[in-house]
Structures are given as structure tokens and as C-alpha cells.
Amino acid sequence: MPIAAATDFALNAILRPISDIFVLIYGLLEPINAHLIPEHTNFIYGQLSLLLWGTKFLATILGVTANNATAMANFTDVLHTLSENSYHFFGTVEGESGMAYIAKHSYIELSQNQQLSEDMAVKFARAVNSTIIYFVKVFEYL
């Protein structure tokens, strides 16, 4: 016996939490964007404006999906199809198919190829460092 109807699950466990995250992101970024004038470092203003627009757009899609019975039924059908076909997508614990196969063989490749794993670790650390530097520079311009 199911704990809840599929539409209740889709609405309360998926759509509303994601919508709340969008509201939180928008609520945090809007005061920063309102403080900036359009001429203020075009790069930063443009990126924040684009991020805010994208957040509003995705929140609108979630709102329409949650409030429209047809869209909600289609979303629920998609969730049902994904749950039935998850074996093919995620694979088995043994790693014989799907994403588990990719993860298993990636792990084997990285554990056997020291040079590749070191290169990937260095590139990941540099990417994290560049991201931190970027956000520090953004806040310096504010």
C-alpha cells in the first residue's frame, strides 16, 4: 500500500522543496542585484541578472506544473516511468549495467592509472580554486 498518492509525493516531496530553493536563491540575490546599477561592472550585473531571470523562469515552470492538473498528471507519469525503468538507468549493485557500470569502471581506471587520477585531482583543485577566486572578486566589486 503506498504511503501517499503519486501526485502528493510529486507536489510535496519534489516540486515544493525545489520551488522553495528557487525562492531562497531569488531572495538572497535580489537585494544584491537591486544595489547594483546597470553600469556597475557589466560582467557581474549581467551574470546576476541572468541568474535571477533563470531562477524566476524555473520557479514559474514549477508553479505552473504544481497548479495545473494536466501538467501534474504528466509529471507523475514521468516519475512512474522513471521508477519502473530505473534498473536500466542506474544498473545493479554488481555494476553490470547503467550508471553503476560507468562508476565501477571509472573507479577501476582511476585506481589503476595513477597519472590520470593525479591529473584529475589537480584539475579539480584548480577548478575549485578558480571558483573561489571568482566569487571573492565578485564580492570585491560590490
Curated annotation (Swiss-Prot):
Q: Where are the transmembrane segments?
A: 12-29, 44-66
UniProt KW Cell membrane keyword: yes
Primary localization: membrane
Q: What is this protein's record name?
A: Uncharacterized protein AF_2122
Query: What is the topology of this protein in the membrane according to its UniProt annotation?
Result: Multi-pass membrane protein
Q: What is the lineage of its organism?
A: Archaea, Methanobacteriati, Methanobacteriota, Archaeoglobi, Archaeoglobales
Cellular component aspect of the GO annotation: plasma membrane
- Recorded source organism is Archaeoglobus fulgidus (strain ATCC 49558 / DSM 4304 / JCM 9628 / NBRC 100126 / VC-16)
User: Where does the record place it?
Assistant: Cell membrane
- Keywords in alphabetical order, please: Cell membrane, Membrane, Transmembrane, Transmembrane helix
